[in-house]
Design a protein with these regions (language model features):
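Catalytic cores of alpha/beta
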Residues: 62-71, 110-118, 153-171
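Glycine-rich beta-to-alpha transition loops that act as phosphate-gripper elements at the mouths
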Residues: 8, 52-63, 82-84, 103-109, ...
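Glycine-rich phosphate-binding active-site loops on the catalytic face of alpha/beta enzymes
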Residues: 74-86, 121-134, 164-185
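Glycine-enriched alpha-helix->loop->beta-strand junction motifs that scaffold or abut catalytic
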Residues: 22-23, 46-49, 75-77, 97-100, ...
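C-terminal helical cap(s) of enzyme catalytic domains, especially alpha/beta-barrels
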Residues: 91-92, 96, 138, 159-162, ...
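Conserved N-terminal beta1-alpha1 strand-loop-helix module at the mouth
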Residues: 1-50, 56-61, 73
Length: 196
């Protein structure tokens, strides 16, 4: 995207985690109505490209289009819509924006052909334990579509996602609380600060 090769994508909106990550990009999606102030905070913290969630599930219609425009104006590298987003909204986004429209795919029953026809430029595959299987099915029929996908919780699941054909893997970092727990446990034992 814009001459950048993106292989690792951090799934977080926590600015302290984002600032201390070496991922190639950030995907800023969250389970609430998207807000430009959150996008702004993430964009200011990140020194890498940011893909911004603009709704499609809880948030619908004209608001999604407005959030997409706003994200583009703020400098997002792409906008992400959730699986329930109608193809008509994907089409409107594609016509209105100059940045990639990334559509989340959660099941093999999703209308992949319709998504592409509407203007999806990248798929964000998030099918839990079936992610590698779904990637393979998409890749077989559409070998050239860029795919970012959830890597899962282990090195093995990440490797399976890559082997299935994902171009980039999203990774969920530990929370601040989890990191602090490890640090404080080490301090209580008078051990060195753990590395991350």
């Amino acid at each position: 995207i814009c001459g950048r090769r993106i292989k690792s994508v951090l799934f977080s909106t926590d600015v302290s985690i984002i600032r201390n990550s070496n991922a190639d990009a950030v995907i800023a999606v969250y389970p609430f109505t998207p807000q430009p102030v959150i996008t702004q905070a993430v964009m200011m913290a990140a020194d890498t490209p940011v893909f911004v969630g603009i709704g499609g599930g809880l948030t619908k219609g004209e608001r999604v289009l407005g959030l997409g425009r706003h994200a583009e104006y703020q400098g997002a590298f792409g906008v992400v819509v959730n699986a329930p987003t109608p193809n008509s909204t994907v089409k409107e986004l594609k016509e209105a924006l100059d940045i990639p429209v990334i559509v989340t795919v959660v099941s093999e029953e999703d209308d992949i052909a319709g998504r592409l026809e509407a203007g999806a430029e990248i798929f964000n595959v998030s099918a839990a334990s079936k992610t590698p299987e779904l990637i393979e099915k998409i890749r077989k029929k559409y070998p050239d579509i860029p795919i970012m996908a959830t890597g899962g919780p282990t090195d093995e699941t990440i490797k399976a996602t890559i082997a299935a054909g994902a171009n980039a893997v999203t990774w969920t970092p530990p929370t601040n609380g989890e990191v602090f727990k490890d640090i404080m446990d080490a301090y209580r034992k008078h051990q060195e600060h753990p590395t991350y």
